[in-house]
Amino acid sequence: MKKLFKISAAAAMIGVLALAASGCGGGSSKKANVTNEMVKFGVTNFADNLDPADNFFSWVVMRYGLGECLVKFDNKMNATPWLADKWSISDDKLTWTFHINDKVKFSNGDKLTAEIAKESLERTFKLSNRAQSIFQYAEIKADGQNLIIKTKNPTPSLPGMLADPLFIIIDTKVKDRDIKKQGPICTGPYAVKTYSKAKAVMVANPNYWDGAVPFKNAEIPTIDDPNTRAMALQKGEIDFAINIAAGDLQLFKDKAKYNISEIASLRTVLAQINMNEGKPLHDPKVRAALIQCLDRVTYNKVLLKDTFIPGKAPVPPSLDYGFDQLKDPNAYNPENAKKLLAEAGWKDTNGDGYVDKNGKNLEIDFVFYSGRAELPLYAEATQADAKKIGIKVNMKNVDYNVLDPMRQKGQFDLIISNILTANTGDPEVYLNWYWKSNINGSQPQNSTGYSNPKFDALSDKLAVEFDPAKRLSLIHI
């Protein structure tokens, strides 16, 4: 029994722009105010600060136009040059040489050198245990504008790994800056003017190296509630809104007023199941019963208006690894779910509507955050369907900054989040984070107790395989 159930995969990523060029605004009476002087983005935000080595905050640093990496991805998820304009690998497959683009400057005018890039990467590894779970290096050194990384083992995906926002390059020459309060000095098109979790104000980087910066100023208010975010766009209070809830999409169908950007996502929504000994979901029959009682098809069709699809595998169909050929082993079957609970010794002996054993009801704590509109909907639907077979689900809505530490400490029975499945170009790192055995903290995201030697062996083969066809075969579901 896998340690997590996929209740949704390949979510559509949806953003809306209130059109300004046509003279139409973000609502029926107010015009959008997009100009070269100012643009306003309504976003969700989980970052308490802008230190890219803290938590997953590097994603915000990049999304806000501050940070850039040595490498980036093209539209087909191929690793392409960014701050490094070329790279090569030694014959022994252990030493990579990345040449730093001589044109790149930080927002304060400092030139990006290989030495600064080296110090920035070393800082990330010092402060983030997640970096070690992506790749491990034996040595990093600078030789002129060449950044030389020697890995402990052959690492075929290293360029893609360095495209993860965790490895944003910051100016380490600046010693007197409080990065958590002021944000880092980076190479992106914008620099921080002011930052709080509630609102960020960015200004154009006067030293930007890669073309014209479109707006002189950008205001980025945090509007976590999806309905409020949609309303702000309608009223013309913001010019862009991201992650529009499925139920609000019909508000923006007027193409004269709004432009909707919608793509098949590489993200997936998954709930991890804590199967450690002593937990209520330690019993495989109870885990199977829980999964089989959930009507995921209806969740996605009715609650989310077909903007999501039911999941049945770790990797979504937007990545070509055989998703459509799979049969869901735990499809919706509430009657069989009840049977499984009975076989596991859980029965409602006192008529309170919940199954019990040894005088205790079967209760599970479901931890979620509400920054993404779909997560509370799934949690509520899970609570309702689980009750039908006698499982009591206690809802725990927490801030994301609380959720991830709870995940790493195993302080949950169920925990749900929205995850990127190819942050390094393919699913290798994502699969390792949530499925590979967590030995001495090597995979801190996997605190569920799940461990499978067969998976670990396949993962170890994938980690050193350079041939694309063989990598595809190893990942293929």
Residue ranges and their predicted role:
Residues G42-I89, E122, I185-C186:
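N-terminal lobe/hinge region of extracytoplasmic solute-binding protein
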Residues D74-N78, A163-V213, N217, P334-E335, ...:
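Gly/Pro-rich hinge or "lid" segments in bacterial periplasmic/extracellular proteins
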Residues D85-L127, I148, P280:
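Aromatic- and charge-enriched surface segment that lines or borders ligand/interaction sites
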Residues S88, D92, Q132-K173:
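Surface-exposed binding/hinge segments that line
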Residues P206-L251, K392-N394, D399:
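Ligand-site clamp/hinge motif
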Residues P310-T349, S370-L377:
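Structural transition elements
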Residues K347-A422:
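Ligand/substrate-recognition segments at binding pockets and active sites
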Residues K392-L403, N432-I475:
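Extracytoplasmic/peripheral linker and loop segments enriched in polar/acidic and small residues
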